[in-house]
Amino acid sequence: MLSFIHTADVHLDAPLHMLADRYELRQDDVRRTLQTIRDLVVSRQVDFWLIAGDLLEYHGGRRATAVFLRDLFESVAPIPVCIAPGNHDPWRADSFYQTMDWPGNVYWFTPEWGVYEFPEKSCVIYGWGFGQPHVYESPLATFPGKLEGYRHHLMVLHGTILNATKDEHQPYAPMSLQELVQADVDYVALGHIHKPEQFVHPLKKRPLAAYPGSPEGLTNKETGERCVLHGELDDAGKLTLQAIPVSQRQIHKLTIHAQGAETAEQLIAGMEAQLGRIADRDLVYVTLTGERAAHFVPSIPVLEQRFSRFFLFAITDETWPDIDAQKLMAEDSIWGKWLAKLAQIEANARSEEEREIARLAKQEALARIGGSMR
């Protein structure tokens, strides 16, 4: 039985400016998450720790963070740590990956395919790493093929599986599922896409490759539990994968309807009903929407203060007042003319995108009108 821990897309020292004064605290969270992963590597006595890229930012990465990684990897020796650099941490001459000395149990993959043999485990690990931030060709096009005489074959890669779940990341190092099948390895440890996803071998009907997702949420799009993958590969080639939660905090993104709210207290009571089960240590992003009483305009500072118990609480107000727009447009007033103009723009829109922009503009106009009413 062969076992491994697979992670990717840690993004240490990433420039997450939206965190403002919480930035260094979140960087500490990411380091503690890596320590949690290290503890799993040791406690589960795995054979390998596989890291599929975007570990430490090339731009903005700090030497102190690189030293932290060096010490962390040394603490799991002699367990091999196999790293395939990604587009955010390419294998460049001036990167910490090359300018620092690393423990002997750290195995780097470069833009030239690497092949590391572990005869005592009857295993070969193949890998390829970015040499620059932008790669538009499939690295598998130059894969040299498997070595004979070994029972287990693993691969570590950072890139995009074409036709995978849509993601906002650039399709760097694009690969097809068929290329992975043709490589004929037992498992491909992938990185680049921050949303967890597994790919099943079309013939063998077992996991062939996977993205574990980022182990600590980086933006408000990376919500919920964040995990690493624990893999076990038996002598017959049967692979099982287990997702293990490791994040220090969770990110929550909610849309809360303020329908009918006439006071701050009514709105807060409705919000508490939805936010009450979220841990104080977590990050919460709320969008308020829906029609509210025209005489009530939510105060963002008040709401931020009321929910300051959360590690981070950010709120956006997209509500609109319960104003009779048709009645206003019939009046000869500035407000009525404004709404009539927006209604005309919406009616003449040439695409759904233009119509949506007009609708949002109308909501903004109604919000401003409501704010002036008594």
Question: Which positions does each model-derived feature cover?
Answer:
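Amphipathic, non-transmembrane alpha-helical secondary structure
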Residues: 31-42, 67-70, 140-144, 265-272
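His/Asp/Glu-rich metal-coordinating catalytic cores
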Residues: 23, 48, 57-227, 232
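Glycine-rich, Lys/Arg-enriched anion-binding loops that position phosphate/diphosphate groups
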Residues: 200, 208, 212-215, 219-223, ...
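N-terminal active-site segment of His-dependent metallophosphoesterases
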Residues: 1-68, 356, 360-374
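Conserved residues at the C-terminal ends of beta-strands
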Residues: 52, 191, 289
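Glycine-rich phosphate-binding loop signature in dinucleotide/nucleotide-binding domains
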Residues: 43-45, 147-149, 277-279
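Accessory, non-catalytic peripheral segments of nucleic-acid enzymes
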Residues: 238-374
